[in-house]
């Protein structure tokens, strides 16, 4: 008999300081927060999550927010940066590679 241990990774999640959509969901004060994500991960047996930053609506500094939050949970969370999202003024402007390089230097990025 073999016992297999698997690490379960959610490869695409989002988290925000402020709920970005209108109308807000009833629990918009907690929905989308890192702590809520971790609770959902624990509840569903997920070991690690990739946080795909999205500088959407009320969260223009989402890269910074996520970077600060993952410092508290480095074993559980991984950050992917947002350098060219459709909600930003930089969308489809030249310099995405330079913005990614700058983000990689500033944050502990994995992607």
Where is each model-derived feature located?
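An N-terminally biased module of ancient metal coordination in phosphate/nucleic-acid-related enzymes
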Residues: 1-64
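Active-site gating/metal-coordination segments in enzymes
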Residues: 48, 57-111
């Amino acid at each position: 008999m073999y016992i297999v241990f698997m690490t379960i990774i959610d490869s695409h999640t989002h988290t925000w300081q402020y709920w970005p959509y209108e109308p807000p969901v009833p629990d918009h004060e907690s929905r989308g927060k890192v702590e809520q994500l971790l609770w959902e991960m624990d509840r569903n047996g997920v070991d690690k999550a990739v946080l795909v930053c999205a500088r959407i609506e009320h969260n223009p500094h989402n890269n910074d927010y996520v970077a600060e939050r993952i410092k508290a949970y480095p074993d559980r969370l991984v950050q992917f940066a947002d350098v060219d999202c459709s909600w930003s003024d930089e969308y489809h402007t030249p310099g995405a590679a330079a913005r990614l390089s700058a983000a990689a230097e500033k944050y502990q990025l994995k992607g």
